Amino acid sequence: NEKMLSDPHFKVLHYESDASVMFTNTEIKGGVVISYRDKNKSYGAIRVFTPYEELNSIMKKAAPTNEAESLMENIYIQNKFDLEKLYKDHPEYRAVIGSEGRDKRFRNNIFEKVSIFTEERQNKGDIRVLGVSKNKRVWMYIPEKYVETEHENLKNWKVLVARVNGSGNLGEVLSTPVVEAPNEGYTQTFIGIGSFKVEAEAQNALKYIKSKFCRTMLGILKITQDNNRDTWRMVPLQDFTAHSDIDWSKSVAEIDQQL
């Protein structure tokens, strides 16, 4: 597929999402494409295929030309345990943590598996962690010494977005993204966007994530519920500081007009 999409002599003539239109009583997930190749003509490499002409046009104008210009580069996965310190005080957890006790990651169900997490803060330096328990978002606390503090955004502001969201429809609204403060972490249920020194920049990033433009660009690669880091590759990175060409003090609708 990558070879064909990089071939300047290749083009798509027609896409049909419902394969049964062309092949009766046949289910082909993803649909059917009618393609054409002429070695004597150059149509320009497709790179990324979408079935929407308008979206193809937007993508050619606005999509990042390299990963450094993509919001994907500012997306970070869940926090992790400092297992050496955890097992020193609580060797019993080695039997319940995955990969025979070697899995550092705050997995989706970690609140149920490891009782070191508490509903109330026990000490001033405890890390507040956002996760899901019994199908509800909950905040729990864990002593800082049991958490790897080298994580990219643990000590800074960030925006959290659910790692599984919607159904993959183009431009669909993201499920309640939230701004998280320094010394607050998150489980595998979420991805973290940004690592900001000041709250204002995180709030600006939140507005961007809610914008129709951002959701449309996300929809280029997000075709399922999965909202992992790579699906954000076509979303352009923005300057979220006060020096930006975009006036972030405006409403999301007004920011969309600037984008």
PLM feature spans:
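Conserved Class I SAM-dependent methyltransferase catalytic core
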Residues: 1-21, 34-36, 205
